[in-house]
A protein has these predicted regions:
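Helix-rich effector regions associated with P-loop NTPase G domains
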Residues: 1-27, 34-35, 40-55, 62, ...
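Canonical P-loop GTPase G-domain recognition
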Residues: 63-122
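Short, well-ordered alpha-helical segments in soluble proteins
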Residues: 103-110, 125, 136-140, 148, ...
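Short coil/loop residues immediately preceding or within conserved phosphate-binding loops
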Residues: 116, 139, 154
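Glycine-rich phosphate-binding P-loop
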Residues: 119-138, 142, 168
């Protein structure tokens, strides 16, 4: 089942963001470092290109992502003309504090009290936009929470006389083109609970972990490498249920509860540092999709294309 979630408040948030875009200087596009392309909202790109606003791509939650893969993503993005990217974690306030300077480089004309730099934070739900704003402000002004759609309206605050920052509600888009993107977004808690089926999302996640991070699965759930080598995604969840004593009446494994355990463990980062996609897996997915009968011709990972004002960039892939 294709995952889609575009509740009414997102449509009004999109219209409001389009309006605000006229009165800001730089977009801080927050992506999830564990799934940078799947968490890239085409609406954000469309809105900022309409107004020709420069953009800093920030791969947030880098503390949860595989550092080697994050490094590959940063190199990948920074190779593209007009794209500036860095990775960070809101858990490291020192890294976040560098953002105004990096944004300033993208809009060098906005650099005094008369023309303060106006930054707009945009991104998918639950990616850490409000947390980022609170860290920059060094105050808990915006409400945050580990669920999608916590912020429902825009809020602009003055960082100091030279900088203002606007937090926006998380935005998805009306049609997520690739099923695996919907599943990655759902696994990472960017999709409303009613728009997904935990068991389906957890089965996708288990399959991905089995292929890419079997050692992390083995150590978290006390399964041997041999056991894992012989099972599929569904049986991984079954085994988690049995290891954790999650049973229904009659002794049958409680698949639903075990699915929730796996999803929560991934979201909390207790499995270890995991990236759901790499530049190479992204390209392979797009090639597969394009080869399907009637399949869309995929754009390669990243946006490519336009020249934007040059900025100094830093590559803090570790994010811890
Ligand atoms: N591990 C980790 N967690 C983070 C980071 N940044 C934010 N979070 C957590 O992510 C969750 C969502 O944060 P919010 O700031 O509410 O996210 P948001 O993008 O404003 O979400 P919406 O308002 O729903 O669109 C919270 O539980 C934060 O503590 C980070 O860099 N690392
Ligand atoms: Mg928020």
């Amino acid at each position: 089942m294709a995952i889609q979630w575009f509740p009414g408040h997102m449509n009004s948030a999109r219209l409001k963001a389009a309006e605000t875009m006229a009165a800001i200087d730089v977009v801080i596009e927050l992506l999830d470092a564990r799934l940078p392309e799947a968490s890239t909202n085409p609406l954000v790109r469309e809105l900022r290109l309409q107004r020709q606003r420069p953009c800093l791509k920030v791969l947030n939650k880098a503390d949860l992502a595989d550092p080697q893969v994050t490094r590959a993503w940063i190199e990948h993005y920074n190779r593209q003309p007009g794209v500036r990217a860095l990775a960070l974690s809101c858990r490291k306030p020192g890294d976040v504090a560098r953002l105004p300077t990096l944004c300033q480089a993208l809009a060098p004309h906005r650099n005094d009290n008369v023309k303060p730099l106006r930054m707009l934070i945009m991104g998918i739900p639950n990616v850490g936009k409000s947390t980022l704003m609170n860290v920059l402000l060094k105050r808990r002004i915006a409400k945050v929470g580990d669920e999608p759609a916590v912020t429902r309206s825009q809020q602009t605050l003055q960082l100091d006389v030279r900088h203002s920052i606007t937090d926006t509600p998380g935005l998805l888009w009306p049609k997520i083109a690739y099923a695996s993107d919907g599943l990655m977004l759902a696994a990472s808690n960017a999709i409303g609970r009613n728009a997904m089926i935990d068991e389906e999302v957890a089965t996708f996640l288990a399959g991905l972990l089995l292929r890419r991070y079997p050692a992390l699965l083995a150590s978290r759930y006390g399964l041997s490498a041999e056991q894992l080598a012989a099972v599929d995604a569904v049986s991984v969840i079954d085994r988690i249920a049995r290891r954790r004593g999650l049973c229904r009446r009659g002794g049958e494994a409680d698949f639903e509860k075990a699915a929730k355990v796996l999803l929560q463990d991934y979201r909390d980062g207790v499995l270890g540092r995991i990236s759901l996609e790499t530049p190479a897996t992204r390209d392979a997915m797009l090639a597969d999709e394009a080869a399907k009968p009637g399949g869309a011709v995929g754009t390669p990972a990243g946006e490519g294309g336009r020249e934007l004002p040059a900025a100094t960039t830093t590559e803090a892939a570790d994010g811890r």
